[in-house]
């Protein structure tokens, strides 16, 4: 399918879903549907996307040019590849905070001059919006893939928890600013990105609610329990460190058990 190849090309180009949609003159929802294979794309728009991404249009449209996304790839985390300005901004915002970091701090980390940075990124706000767009774009793509692998609400719930934990450990810096710097966003970006976060929460809400309806989760407070589970996962960047003794996969397995306890999952009886 052309959609996953377009997504891969966009991510290699360091472009967010929002920036791509704006450049191609479509809505974010439409471009997301294209990348996920839920809607068709015209040849002209494929060509425009290829030009935007600096990709070969023939590779994008040839069925055998790239393998389809394999099951489980949402668990794979290659090194984060950001353009230098965004990598510099991420480093500065994590270390100094959005309000504490200056454009000069970002430029130094990006190994650019201040005028050179301003040429492409006129304000810190543009950098923050791009980083949070990238964060939510990757997280939602992974969460949708994880959820799609599940057979029934309990498995979908546990896969979503695993996905959240893996993202907030492997992508700890993105997760950190996602939790700490929402207050720095200005409108309309703040409302738009907040809506994406709500959409992620609703994925978990839906599985907890359905498992409760089937008698598989017994919490009397499914709404609150689902929010507690997501908050527990998104808080990981505040304490987990790659230098610590527990690798991401182990943390994920532990948190799945914690989450099942929170929702009071029915466990098989011993013996």
Q: Which residues are covered by each model-predicted region?
A:
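Short secondary-structure transition hinges
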Residues: 170-205
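Hydrophobic alpha-helical bundle segments that form small-molecule/ligand-binding pockets
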Residues: 23, 148-150, 186, 198-225
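An amphipathic alpha-helix adjacent to DNA-recognition modules
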Residues: 39, 43-46, 65, 82-87, ...
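Hydrophobic/aromatic-rich alpha-helical bundle segments in the mid-to-C-terminal region
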Residues: 175-179, 190, 194, 212-258, ...
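Helix-turn-helix
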Residues: 24-30, 36, 92, 96-126, ...
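Hydrophobic alpha-helical connector segments
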Residues: 84, 130, 145-173
């Amino acid at each position: 399918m052309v959609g996953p190849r377009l997504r891969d090309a966009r991510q290699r180009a360091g472009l967010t879903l929002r920036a791509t949609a704006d450049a191609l003159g479509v809505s974010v929802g439409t471009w997301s549907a294209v990348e996920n294979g839920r809607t068709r794309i015209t040849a002209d728009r494929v060509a425009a996307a290829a030009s935007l991404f600096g990709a070969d249009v023939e590779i994008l449209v040839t069925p055998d040019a790239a393998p389809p996304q394999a099951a489980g790839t949402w668990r794979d985390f290659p090194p984060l590849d950001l353009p230098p300005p965004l990598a510099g901004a991420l480093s500065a915002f994590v270390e100094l905070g959005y309000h504490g970091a200056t454009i000069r701090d970002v430029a130094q980390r990006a190994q650019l001059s201040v005028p050179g940075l301003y040429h492409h990124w006129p304000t810190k706000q543009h950098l923050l919006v791009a980083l949070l767009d990238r964060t939510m774009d990757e997280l939602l793509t992974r969460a949708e893939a994880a959820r799609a692998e599940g057979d029934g609400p309990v498995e979908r719930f546990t896969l979503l928890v695993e996905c959240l934990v893996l993202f907030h450990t492997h992508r700890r810096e993105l997760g950190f600013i996602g939790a700490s710097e929402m207050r720095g966003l200005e409108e309309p970006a703040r409302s738009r990105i907040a809506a994406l976060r709500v959409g992620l929460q609703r994925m978990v809400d839906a599985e907890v609610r359905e498992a409760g309806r089937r008698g598989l989760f017994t919490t009397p407070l499914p709404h609150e329990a689902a929010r507690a589970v997501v908050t527990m996962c998104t808080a990981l960047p505040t304490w987990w460190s790659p230098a610590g003794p527990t690798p991401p996969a182990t943390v994920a397995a532990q948190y799945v058990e914690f989450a099942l306890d929170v929702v009071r999952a029915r466990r098989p009886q011993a013996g």
